[in-house]
């Protein structure tokens, strides 16, 4: 395992030799570009919305981004359309999320079916090999896909790495211990049978998020980001789906993912083409993700300085620089 980046200068140094400055300028100019092509791809259970920016026939392999949740949308990746100056950037909403169909049938809420969506998109776009980037719940889908379809994967990025519910809950409990004593007590009470008033629980959740998932120093959304989200958010976050698969609380799993653990699949990855990517203050604890990287021979680990679980929104330039450099290096091999 190699630790790729702990500081901004290191992150930007991973951009191609053409220069980090040029990459930053490109990101500013092309981030949050509206979709150049949109299509609805048939999958098991309905159709998923897909957008493409950039040239699918470019020399550099396309990259697809897989959003978290379950039940969230692709919009958190909108700034990464900046990468379309070198390769096709593919974004999509999972079934029952955002711009995709919303049958809201719990029979569809299975890991294998979500993995199947990704393969259906690849076939619809006639892509032979692509880079697969997942974040949070999307990292689990990326891992499952890369383990099942290695011939079609140029590289795998597991961002804000969720691949095991037991590990995630253990990590969350450790993170809670670093919060203010009163916040710790409130969270424990809110997870118990005699819950305090709802506002106290919401305040405790906000305190946790401010530390690990949406830090207060995040830059405000640009006009371009706001316009992009308004245009492509669709029906937005699906709380029913989230609660069914995870549960109503960030601090405990009560849904169908309660026993989920894909850690054994790490052994099936091509480690030299695998990057673990987390924020410095990520809800996905660095110690846990470092262990995952050690289980994946040859894998790299990159840390976005100053970022939490929402590192892409909080540190967009650093995130774009890391990904740009990683994708270029894996294209060359």
Which residues make up each language-model segment?
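Alpha/beta-hydrolase
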Residues: 185-277
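Active-site loop/oxyanion-hole signature of alpha/beta-hydrolase fold enzymes
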Residues: 94-137, 321
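Catalytic active-site module of serine/aspartate enzymes centered on a nucleophile-bearing elbow/loop
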Residues: 298-333
């Amino acid at each position: 395992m190699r630790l790729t980046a702990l500081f901004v200068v290191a992150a930007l140094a991973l951009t191609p030799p053409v220069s980090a400055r040029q990459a930053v300028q490109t990101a500013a100019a092309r981030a949050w570009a509206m979709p150049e092509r949109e299509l609805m791809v048939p999958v098991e259970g309905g159709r998923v919305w897909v957008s493409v920016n950039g040239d699918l026939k470019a020399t550099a392999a396309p990259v697809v981004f897989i959003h978290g949740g379950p039940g969230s949308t692709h919009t958190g990746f909108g700034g990464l359309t900046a990468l379309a100056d070198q390769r096709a950037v593919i974004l999509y909403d999972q079934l029952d999320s955002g711009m995709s169909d919303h049958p809201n049938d719990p029979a569809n809420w299975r890991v294998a079916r979500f993995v199947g969506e990704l393969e259906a998109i690849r076939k619809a776009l006639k892509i032979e090999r692509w880079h697969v980037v997942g974040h949070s719940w999307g990292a689990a889908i990326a891992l499952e896909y890369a383990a099942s379809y290695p011939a079609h994967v140029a590289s795998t990025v597991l961002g804000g790495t969720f691949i095991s519910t037991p590990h995630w809950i253990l990590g969350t409990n450790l993170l809670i211990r670093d919060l203010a004593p009163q916040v710790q007590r409130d969270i424990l009470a809110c997870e118990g049978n005699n819950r305090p008033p709802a506002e106290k629980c919401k305040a405790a959740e906000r305190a946790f998020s401010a530390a690990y998932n949406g830090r207060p120093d995040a830059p405000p959304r640009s006009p371009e980001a706001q316009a992009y989200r308004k245009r492509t958010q669709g029906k937005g976050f699906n709380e029913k789906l989230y609660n069914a698969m995870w549960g109503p609380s960030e601090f405990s799993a009560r849904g169908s993912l309660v026993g989920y653990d894909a850690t054994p699949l790490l052994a099936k990855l091509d480690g030299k083409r695998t990057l673990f990517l987390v924020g410095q203050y990520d809800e996905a604890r660095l110690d846990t993700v470092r262990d995952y990287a050690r289980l994946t021979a040859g894998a790299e680990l990159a840390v976005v300085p100053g970022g939490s679980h929402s590192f892409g929104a909080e540190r967009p330039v650093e995130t774009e620089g890391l990904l740009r450099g990683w994708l270029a290096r894996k294209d060359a091999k």
